[in-house]
Regions:
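Intrinsically disordered, low-complexity acidic Ser/Thr-rich regulatory segments
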Residues: 1-40, 52, 87, 96, ...
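C-terminal boundary/linker segments immediately following FHA domains
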Residues: 26, 68-103
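Short hydrophobic/aromatic patches on the structural cores and recognition surfaces of FHA
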Residues: 26, 45-50, 54-59, 63-69, ...
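Residue-level marker for the onset of beta-strands and adjacent loop->beta junctions
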Residues: 13, 33, 45, 76-78, ...
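Structured beta-strand/turn binding interfaces of compact recognition modules in eukaryotic regulators
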Residues: 9, 29, 61, 72, ...
Length: 103
């Protein structure tokens, strides 16, 4: 099995976001978020990453400054499938999707 994660594009500026089974909510408010990203432009509840039977999906939670997939702003409330190597940005916090094999 593979472990999916989002790795910071700025050399470890932000901790890795590990996508364990289930949902990961990214935002700037401790309550309700799985991953806290206290940066300017990041909404309290910014985006959600979900694991489904056919892959990993990204969902913008009506954030103020948007969620971007490979440089394009995604539409809030719609699921976007993400793949290894994709670039994801929450406001201007940029990450790349990587996988590693679990032993």
């Amino acid at each position: 099995p593979k472990e999916w994660m989002l790795k910071s594009m700025k050399d470890g500026k932000y901790p890795d976001i590990h996508l364990q089974k289930g949902n990961v909510v990214i935002g700037s408010m401790a309550e309700g978020c799985t991953y806290l990203l206290k940066e300017r432009g990041v909404s309290r509840l910014h985006a959600k990453i979900m694991e489904k039977a056919d892959g990993i999906y990204l969902l913008d939670l009506n954030s103020t400054n948007g969620t971007f997939l490979n440089g394009e702003m995604i539409e809030p409330g719609r699921d976007y499938k993400i793949e290894e190597g994709d670039m994801v940005a929450f406001a201007n916090c940029e990450f790349v999707i990587v996988t590693s094999l679990l032993n």
